[in-house]
């Protein structure tokens, strides 16, 4: 268990800056939403998405490449180190999608869509992870336990991507509608 705890701590080191960035940037999206400034919203959303995804991909790649030196900062026991290194690698396989999940959750909250935000937010450590962590260890033992985190992360990322593309489509339609309305009023 100490090895998995090390892997989770390393995972949180990457997750917390992304979460903090999204919480801070949420106010910009909320302001744009309230002002119906869809150009500002799209510009801010694309920037948020770029920053969160770039950071999460870079962080996960760095952890996968440097898993052993990172783990050795927490433990000098070889057995713990071996398990922690493999745990780090598995936990970070799909961590690049965490940036998307965090961005989508913040965006939905800024738009006042709390229920949909909860669906995205609870996927990763809730309704996708709990069944996986109960089922996969029975089927594949400890490897199944480790895989359950990666599988839940992948599933949550796919849900977040689907919702994100849908929300961007709605924003673009609102922008076109607002533009056509402005032309209709002016003409």
What are these regions (language model features)?
Residues 102, 128-137:
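Transmembrane alpha-helical segments of integral membrane proteins
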Residues 98-101, 127, 156-159:
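Membrane-embedded alpha-helical transmembrane segments of multi-pass integral membrane proteins
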Residues 1-12, 79-86, 113, 147:
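Interfacial/gating helices of multi-pass transporter permease domains
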Residues 29-94, 135-187:
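Short alpha-helical transmembrane segments in multi-pass integral membrane proteins
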Residues 4-61, 65-67, 98-112, 116-117:
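Small-residue-rich hydrophobic transmembrane alpha-helices
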Residues 91-95, 105-106, 119-122:
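Short, glycine/charged-rich beta-strand-loop motifs at protein surfaces that mediate ligand recognition
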Residues 114-125, 129:
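Cytoplasmic juxtamembrane regions at transmembrane-helix boundaries
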Residues 8-11, 55, 123-125, 152-156:
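Transmembrane alpha-helical core residues of multi-pass small-molecule transporters
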């Amino acid at each position: 268990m100490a090895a998995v705890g090390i892997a989770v701590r390393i995972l949180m080191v990457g997750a917390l800056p992304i979460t903090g960035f999204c919480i801070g940037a949420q106010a910009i999206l909320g302001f744009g939403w309230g002002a119906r400034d869809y150009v500002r919203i799209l510009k801010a959303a694309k920037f948020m998405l770029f920053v969160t995804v770039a950071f999460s991909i870079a962080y996960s790649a760095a952890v996968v490449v440097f898993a052993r030196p990172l783990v050795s900062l927490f433990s000098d026991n070889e057995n713990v180190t071996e398990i922690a290194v493999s745990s780090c690698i598995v936990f970070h396989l799909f961590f690049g999608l965490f940036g998307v999940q965090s961005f989508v959750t913040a965006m939905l909250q800024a738009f006042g869509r709390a229920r949909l935000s909860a669906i995205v937010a609870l996927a990763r450590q809730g309704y996708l992870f709990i069944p996986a962590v109960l089922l996969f260890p029975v089927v594949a033992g400890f490897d199944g336990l480790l895989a359950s985190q990666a599988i839940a992360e992948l599933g949550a990322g796919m849900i977040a991507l689907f919702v994100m593309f849908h929300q961007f489509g709605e924003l673009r339609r609102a922008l076109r509608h607002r533009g056509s309305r402005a032309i209709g009023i002016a003409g």
